[in-house]
């Protein structure tokens, strides 16, 4: 009976740790520049105490997993310029032993595109990212994103991304900013009175 109790307790503990919720909430929007040019905007709200990492790699490609944006169906459009970031900062993090490029609370990414096919209704993207707090990191995970060029289109992001993978399509990875363009977080040495 005791062995059964221990086994059952271990199984329940395993289930509870496997159900850690993602501390991010991702949304997309589209800004139309012209009939053939758009800015695809991705925003992530990040729970307090957690960080999402920049697309910029750390020193010698070490440190946390950098965020990636992988675009599918790229025969219908071109990526123009880099996938810009707003809210990123560099900060020395003891556990990594180096400056880490990260977001806290909120992240914003903007990718400009030019259409090759004016009839496409949406752009499918998979964001791949990792989140950490001061004590743990969750395994890197994908987030399926759809940018609706036609607001009336009704698609399920995971189904679209899976269909591209099932068809054997290789996505194109967006280029992020250079690490040297990210400012170091200012640390105040003034005391509050």
Where in the sequence are the language-model features?
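Extracellular/lumen-exposed scaffold segments
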Residues: 18-193
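Sec-dependent N-terminal signal peptides
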Residues: 3-14
């Amino acid at each position: 009976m005791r062995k059964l109790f221990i086994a059952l307790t271990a199984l329940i503990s395993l289930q509870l740790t496997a159900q850690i919720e993602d501390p991010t909430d991702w949304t997309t929007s589209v800004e139309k520049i012209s009939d053939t040019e758009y800015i695809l905007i991705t925003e992530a709200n990040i729970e307090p105490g957690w960080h999402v990492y920049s697309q910029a790699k750390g020193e010698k490609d070490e440190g946390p997993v950098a965020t990636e944006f992988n675009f599918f169906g790229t025969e219908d459009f071109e990526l123009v310029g880099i996938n810009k970031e707003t809210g990123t900062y560099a900060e020395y993090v003891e556990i990594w032993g180096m400056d880490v490029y990260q977001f806290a609370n909120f992240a914003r990414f903007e990718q400009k595109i030019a259409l090759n096919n004016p009839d496409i209704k949406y752009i499918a993207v998979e964001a791949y990212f990792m989140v950490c707090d001061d004590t743990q990191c969750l395994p890197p995970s994908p987030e399926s994103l759809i940018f609706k060029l036609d607001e009336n289109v009704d698609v399920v992001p995971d189904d679209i991304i899976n269909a591209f993978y099932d068809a054997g399509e290789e996505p194109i990875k967006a280029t992020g900013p250079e690490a040297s363009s990210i400012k170091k977080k200012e640390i105040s040495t003034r005391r509050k009175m």
